[in-house]
Amino acid sequence: MQIRQSVKLKKPLIHYITNPISINDCANIILAAGAKPIMAEHPLEVSEITSVSKSLGVNLGNITDNKMKSMLISGKTAYENKIPQVIDLVGVGCSKLRLDYAKKFILECHPNVIKGNMSEIKAIYGIKSSAKGIDVGACDIITEQNFDENIEMIKRLSMETGSVVAATGVVDIISNGTYTYIISNGCEMLSMITGTGCMLTGIIASYISSGNILEGTALAIVLMGICGELSQHVKGTGSFRNELIDNIFSISDDIIIKKIRINSY
């Protein structure tokens, strides 16, 4: 929990280049986590913005030519300045443009965290996926039958890229190739409003700003899962969204410790 308290105390500046569908919620969730968001995306300013930030998040949702250019500039700036960064592989399982771009970004920018659902992780690893648009395909969902092989794939991808790999879903798997965490927190309603994955990436960017990449990523995923559980007993999805942000802001360390469901593998 030291990472969480450090973020709240230091209020690090987080540069997050994301999509217009979720940008407002992403900025608010970063604020709720205790950090300060800046969502700059113009190619002529992003290097300057990234260079004064404590971490960078890039998100492939609703991709455009300008954002592709900007994310690459920011990613290289972050790498050159040893600023932690996370890439969210939104849609790489259904778009060759995004897949090719993500591979280029990973090769040239060396993100500290590669995050996506299992369809997206399989696609970036080079395995055919059954992605349903930006959502995970039914055949790619982690089950008892494919659990071990998926963990091995995630570990190999981590070792090949040098990045922490975070595969999110009903069960979340986070690995740096040596240490692997399995997280079972969360609820179905997290998949019923748009942008929760993008919001999670904002929290990951906030928590890895300390330089503690594996633990920061795992803590962000735990936090989102638990706050989803706490928020689901509401009238509907609109109320859920607001309750989720409120819980990210107000949850105590004691509740996190009480409700966390995490195992090492």
Curated annotation (Swiss-Prot):
ATP binds at K115, T168. It catalyses: 5-(2-hydroxyethyl)-4-methylthiazole + ATP = 4-methyl-5-(2-phosphooxyethyl)-thiazole + ADP + H(+). Pathway: Cofactor biosynthesis; thiamine diphosphate biosynthesis; 4-methyl-5-(2-phosphoethyl)-thiazole from 5-(2-hydroxyethyl)-4-methylthiazole: step 1/1. SUPFAM superfamilies: Ribokinase-like. Gene3D superfamilies: 3.40.1190.20. It comes from the Bacteria. GO terms for biological process: thiamine biosynthetic process; thiamine diphosphate biosynthetic process. Catalyzes the phosphorylation of the hydroxyl group of 4-methyl-5-beta-hydroxyethylthiazole (THZ). Belongs to the Thz kinase family. This is Hydroxyethylthiazole kinase 2.
